[in-house]
Amino acid sequence: MSKSTSTPNPQNEKLKALQLTIDKLEKTYGKGTVMKLSDEVVMDVPVISTGSLGLDIALGIGGLPKGRIVEIYGPESSGKTTLSMHCIAEAQKAGGIAAFIDAEHAFDKTYAEKLGIDTTNLLISQPDNGEQALEIAEHLIRSGAIDIIVIDSVAALVPKAEIEGEMGDSKMGLQARLMSQALRKLTGAINKTGCCCIFINQLREKIGVMFGNPETTTGGNALKFYASVRLDIRRIGQIKESADNITGNRTKVKVVKNKMAPPFKVIEFDIMYGEGISKIGEIIDLGVELGIINKAGSWFSYEGTKLGQGRDAVRTVFLDNPEMQDEIELKIRQKVQLSGVPAAMEAKELEEEEA
């Protein structure tokens, strides 16, 4: 009898060789080093709320993505640090550990506490130079214990050579080189550990720009490329109780870059002095926008009940009736399909469960 010889299938041989290589790589570098996209169902991106309901909606995923780099930039006193502090407070509320690299040496503990930050459990560092700041950040991120880290600000990350040099010395491109090198090292660690890394940045103007926007951010172009989300925050007006009494700022945030959802969304909210982002103001604005609160002229009403004339009157009603505020917030979240439950409702549910 003649034996039938089967010819080897080149495709099978390729797949075998590929599997052997993957097994070898996983043995060396750990499981999941190389995998097919079909091997694992892509889960929703874990996020940290920004503390602004409108901004969470504008970001498309419900907040800032974990395991990614975020840049918040804008002019002076526009609310950059306030927004990042709200992110820290939200991360802490969710049981996370937060760190703040204060390169500007301007951290205000009292203000941070007013925004809801638990300062007793906040890790803070005030480094002497840019290299030290980024090394501290790298070690904290690589520990795998940090959920959110804020670096305030890129402009204050002064290279060691510049600090040690004379006042008039030219140090062209030193900071840009430092940022580029640091981001190359940090990106992988940030992604692996699932830490949300926020860089606060300042604006500068390019000299001699005749056409287009002369504004640019400090620290070179590296951060623009490495950031998954870039937020442009600006003050657009003042909130006054009377002609002489200014109580806050009207603020506009534009999602300039977003790798997680469609970008270029714009949101406006109030930042009140000593309070931060006004949650009530946002609920009123979003409630009207989504048709949950009815507005006729200057009068506001909800489910047939008149709330008052003007935003300030509605604000007072919500302060006296937090249950109504939470109910409207829940309806807003359901309408835009945003996960999460208002904090007061969550606390009430926990109390009921314990009872």
UniProtKB/Swiss-Prot annotation:
Compartments, as annotated in UniProt: Cytoplasm
Domain of life of the organism encoding this protein: Bacteria
Keyword Hydrolase: no
Coiled coil stretches, renumbered: none
GO function terms (MF aspect): ATP binding; ATP hydrolysis activity; ATP-dependent DNA damage sensor activity; damaged DNA binding; single-stranded DNA binding
CDD domains: RecA (cd00983)
Annotated residues for binding of ATP: 74-81
Any single GO CC term annotated in Swiss-Prot or TrEMBL for this entry: cytosol
Family listed: Belongs to the RecA family.
NCBIfam families linked: tigrfam_recA
Name of this protein: Protein RecA
